[in-house]
Amino acid sequence: MKLSEIHMRDPFILPYEGVYYLYGTRSFHDTGFDVYTSTDLVTWSEPHSVFEKSPDFWGTIDFWAPEVHVYKGKFYMFATFINDHTNRGTAILVADSPMGPFRPHSDGAVTPKEWMCLDGTFHLDEDGQPWMVFCHEWVQIQDGTVCAIKLSDDLHHASSEPIELWKASDAPCVRHLGWNDEAFVTDGPFIFRHDGKLMSLWASFDETGYIEVMACSDNGRIDGNWSVDYPALLTGCDSGHGMLFTTFDGKRKFTCHHPNCDPDERPVLYSVDGLTFTKD
């Protein structure tokens, strides 16, 4: 398969032992996750199921944005879920292989239970402290925020109160949603380092549609002061919710979904030079 044949939102690529593993949201209404594999980023396998909803699993809809991170010899999936009786939130699943099967690890969502949250991602700081960085959703607070919370060493639960890193309207390139002039969106944070600086990708909207945006911590730490005073990295192409990874020959790549409309979303790849993205 080619990437253009894969219907997916929120793509995430894990390079591991010579194989690239591609995870993402199947659709808004599906209740499971797949992985696609490749050795060259061009030809991909057929989908292989890594997680399917069981009768006793707490999430019932909105199976969104799976990310898989290697930590202490295990593979941890951060993914978003909701049901009729709880708020949307990011939970953590675990597996012994990037091919799954993944099983529930956290006791429900790790994000605050009283908040509507999504798109949790993993960060391990220089002190070895694990964090989840996530979005407090605009549907609850209008001006969406990106927040962070410390995790227990075993990634089973949160071990601190959340801290707010920035809000969507702080970014000069972000515009409110067209049908709601008080709604500003934060989606898909992804933490990375560039030239020694701790930075984050995230997604929102401007007058052209979905965009990819950037933030930077002033002290190289999650709990620093974050600036979002940057132009959009991607605008005018209705693309976003991206992440960075390094190929096996040492090149940095970016992937996101394009366009941002169902059912046309496909994962796309960009080559990265500094903070300049060029579509492959």
What is each residue range found by the language model?
Residues M1-D280:
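Carbohydrate-active catalytic/glycan-binding domains of CAZyme proteins
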